[in-house]
Amino acid sequence: MAIIPAINEVNFEEIKKKVLLVQSFGSKWAHLDVADGKFTKNVLWNNPEELKVESEKWKVKIEVHLMVESPEDVLGEWLKTGIKRIFVHYESIKDFELLKDKCGAAGVELGLAIGPHIPAEGLFEYNGRVSYFLILAVEPGISGQEFQDNQLEKIRVLREKIPNAKIEVDGGINIRNAFDIKQAGADILVSSSYIWNSGNPKEAYELL
C-alpha cells in the first residue's frame, strides 16, 4: 500500500517547502489540495500559474485534488502545470466526457473523488472510464478532521464492485486507522495533518 503526503495550504511558499520535505521522505508522489471556497467552506491555494513555474524543478510526481464548483471551467489551466494526476469531484461534474477528453489530450490521469455523504453506488457508472477513485472520508477542504468510520463500508463496496480500480482514501488518516482502511480495500492512503502536525513528519510518514 502506498502513502501519499497531502499538502493543504493557502500559501504557495508553504507548499514549496512541504514538497521538498516530501521528496526527502522518499515518497514518489505529493497530493496538493485546491479549494475555491464555493464547493468548500474554506479557500485554499488555487493558482496553477505558480505550480507551472515550480513543478518541473521537483522530483516527486504531483496529483491535484480539485475541490471546486465548476471543474470544467478551470481544468485546462491545471493540465498545463506538469501534474500527473487530477481528481475532480463527482458532485461537481457537469460534463464528464469533456473532462476525460481534456485529460487524455494532456496525458494526465483523471480520477474521481466523492465526499463522505455520497454512496459508493454513485461511482459505479464510471467503472472502466477512470482507473482512480478518491474516497474523501471528511468534509471537503479543511485539514485536521476525524476519519468518518462509516466510510469503511464505502471502501469495501467500491472494492467489491470495481475490483480493478485504484482506491485512494483521504481525510483523518493516522496510525490508528490505517490498517483498517487498508483491509477495507484501499490501495493508497493520503495523509496531511497526521504527518505535518507530528513532531517528526518523516517518521510519521514512515510509520504509516
Stretches with model-predicted labels:
Residues 37-48, 116, 123-156, 160-162, ...:
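Glycine/Thr-rich beta-alpha phosphate-binding loop at enzyme active sites
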Residues 50-62, 101-105, 125-129:
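Short, basic, low-complexity termini and linkers enriched in Ser/Thr/Gly/Pro
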Residues 38-71, 75-76, 178-196:
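A short alpha/beta connector and helix-capping loop motif
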Residues 22, 32-33, 78, 133, ...:
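Conserved, mostly hydrophobic/aromatic
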Residues 2-7, 30-32, 62-66, 86-88, ...:
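Hydrophobic faces of well-ordered beta-strands that scaffold small-molecule active sites
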Residues 86-94, 134-143, 184-205:
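Glycine-rich phosphate-binding active-site loops on the catalytic face of alpha/beta enzymes
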Residues 15-22, 70-80, 117-128, 173-189:
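Catalytic cores of alpha/beta
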